[in-house]
């Protein structure tokens, strides 16, 4: 795999850049006051990076959290907490219940009702805050300079509008879908919907698929989120206010991706890209782990983690993975919380937790087996480690698909995984492995100049829009096709009814005669 035909060294700096932007948004005399309404779970990991950086620059940060928060601690040297005595709705048990189904479709269906409940509880949390006069008086007297929120839930948006303070997003996903589709022009003719698993180069029927997936997803988002937030916004701001318009009015969108990851697409001036901002150089490993890694010799190590939500796998799948690992000369570090697989080889170490970033940055790491979460994807990009993806839910399938298109990942479907399929994917990536080294800014400029010379251009950075006729760009042909299908179906239905009626009338006439 040729690593970083698309790697951009700016990923080393975005954390500092983003904090600078936030700093410019806040009066700098004695440091600003930031009210944070985060999303619990893995999203808190990258929000915490920004919070710690803001604190280090002298800003005062307050974090709103539910009393049963899964990740967000009540006490911290970097922020003060505003704890609301109400369940937040998302916990580890909720996601583990979802793991009983091991196909993406069935798992999505199991989680749909759960997310409906999560957003209901977020709205209850906001109502409890706004109805607490003493709390709101204290918040107003604090005179926060801005609200920083993850718009995967709408609590921070409503709070910022209620307090009439600037709103900044730490964003990839919103309650209305992927962030770009809420704020920026997104022609469906060449901008793929994440759930469609397509690229920016689509055939006619792929564009039909993209169009249909968009319609279905918008319907599902409105069914899952809409009832709660529409009622909440109507209650406090009036029925004429649309909750999505409050999202679109955000001052700044700090997008947790960049064009290393994204396909070329339109954007907006207030969208700031910070893909990989949470990435950092590797720290030394604990002694026992370092000894295990060093024992791999010239073959190196493979690390596997399916994130915080999926700690264990069904026994049959775990056994197939273990067999495939046992056949390799590499050592394997596998984050796994289930029963020890019966087929586990001597080259595989099971751990409850691993310093993932530090392992990815180790010079002996050869491969990352991952579920495809955004944080892990960017850490792998940052450390130039190729990926074998086992995506299951949320944006994981799309994330891995994007990396596959760029030539740095292989995708394996858990629903069809066996030892042969998994072993083949591992071997293909290991055989093609090539690791680049980090570059200084001048080296980056020279790299891209030479890249364009070597490849006679940089076509992967240009959008497909200029190649498309106007009717394709605006999806006119797709809409005409779908309209034709609908009309044909309707005419066929009318024809069948008419035929049935004519036959009935004919029989009645024959009886009368």
Question: Each predicted region: which residue ranges?
Answer:
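Membrane-proximal helical "anchor" segments flanking the first transmembrane region
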Residues: 246-248
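Conserved, non-catalytic sequence blocks in retroelement Pol enzymes and Pol-derived host proteins
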Residues: 241
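Glycosyltransferase specificity loop/lid
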Residues: 3-235, 244, 254, 261, ...
